[in-house]
Amino acid sequence: MKIGIIGAMEEEVTLLRDKIDNRQTITLGGCEIYTGQLNGTEVALLKSGIGKVAAALGATLLLEHCKPDVIINTGSAGGLASTLKVGDIVVSDETRYHDADVTAFGYEYGQLPGCPAGFKADDKLIAAAESCIRELNLNAVRGLIVSGDAFINGSVGLAKIRHNFPDAVAVEMEATAIAHVCHNFNVPFVVVRAISDVADQQSHLSFDEFLAVAAKQSTLMVETLVQKLAHG
């Protein structure tokens, strides 16, 4: 099995990259892909860059060039669920765009023409992630993760997301674009991210302060998940 892993930022991939044995670096379309073995398992780790376009471009290049069997999207996210705090884990059962609006033509808010309203994560990957969470004794929430090209840092943006997606547990900037590409390629995916901030008026301050905490937690989760997927 070859496992594809996608993170947007240097801080979100550096700990995993340093653990890859026999590492080789491929630069394509402004993205960097690191291939090798993570604890004996073949992996391809992509640093995509921030935002939906960068994430979709990178995911497409990763799938075409490295042919992974599954995709894990990792990194940080802003917490929306009331039980979440910095360092906690969110696992997607579905992802949706929070900044797409074609409702004038009868589509659901967040749905693009020709696409499902949301992109469902793979049940087996979800189950494996939840098993890792239990083993690591981490606090986690599974649910809807929403994505858009905006860092949510204020009451207006937050209120709009809560109105349109009252069940959303986290918000970030890449996951749905990655899920969209995986859907088109028919490749199983799951989002496993750690909370770096709560999406409020101080989120930009807590993000800068706690990104390293989120990166450490998400790296631990992904490393454990890769082991479980490879060896059961």
Curated annotation (Swiss-Prot):
Which pathway is recorded for this entry? Amino-acid biosynthesis; L-methionine biosynthesis via salvage pathway; S-methyl-5-thio-alpha-D-ribose 1-phosphate from S-methyl-5'-thioadenosine (hydrolase route): step 1/2
Query: This protein's superkingdom?
Result: Bacteria
Q: Where does substrate bind?
A: G78, I152, M173, E174
> What's any one GO cellular component for it?
cytosol
Keyword S-adenosyl-L-methionine in annotation: no
Which EC number applies? 3.2.2.9
Q: Does the keyword Amino-acid biosynthesis apply?
A: yes
What does the UniProt keyword field contain?
Amino-acid biosynthesis, Hydrolase, Methionine biosynthesis
What are the BP-aspect GO terms? L-methionine salvage from methylthioadenosine; L-methionine salvage from S-adenosylmethionine; purine deoxyribonucleoside catabolic process
Reaction(s) this enzyme catalyzes, per UniProt: S-adenosyl-L-homocysteine + H2O = S-(5-deoxy-D-ribos-5-yl)-L-homocysteine + adenine; S-methyl-5'-thioadenosine + H2O = 5-(methylsulfanyl)-D-ribose + adenine; 5'-deoxyadenosine + H2O = 5-deoxy-D-ribose + adenine
Q: Name one GO molecular function term.
A: adenosylhomocysteine nucleosidase activity
Q: Which residues form the active site?
A: E12 (proton acceptor), D197 (proton donor)
Q: InterPro entries from the entry?
A: MTA_SAH_Nsdase (IPR010049), Nucleoside_phosphorylase_d (IPR000845), Nucleoside_phosphorylase_sf (IPR035994)
Pfam families in the record: PNP_UDP_1 (PF01048)
Q: What does the sequence similarity comment in the record state about its family?
A: Belongs to the PNP/UDP phosphorylase family. MtnN subfamily.
User: What is known about its subunit structure?
Assistant: Homodimer.
Function, please? Catalyzes the irreversible cleavage of the glycosidic bond in both 5'-methylthioadenosine (MTA) and S-adenosylhomocysteine (SAH/AdoHcy) to adenine and the corresponding thioribose, 5'-methylthioribose and S-ribosylhomocysteine, respectively. Also cleaves 5'-deoxyadenosine, a toxic by-product of radical S-adenosylmethionine (SAM) enzymes, into 5-deoxyribose and adenine. Thus, is required for in vivo function of the radical SAM enzymes biotin synthase and lipoic acid synthase, that are inhibited by 5'-deoxyadenosine accumulation.
* Protein name as it appears in the record: 5'-methylthioadenosine/S-adenosylhomocysteine nucleosidase
Taxonomy, top ranks, is: Bacteria, Pseudomonadati, Pseudomonadota, Gammaproteobacteria, Enterobacterales
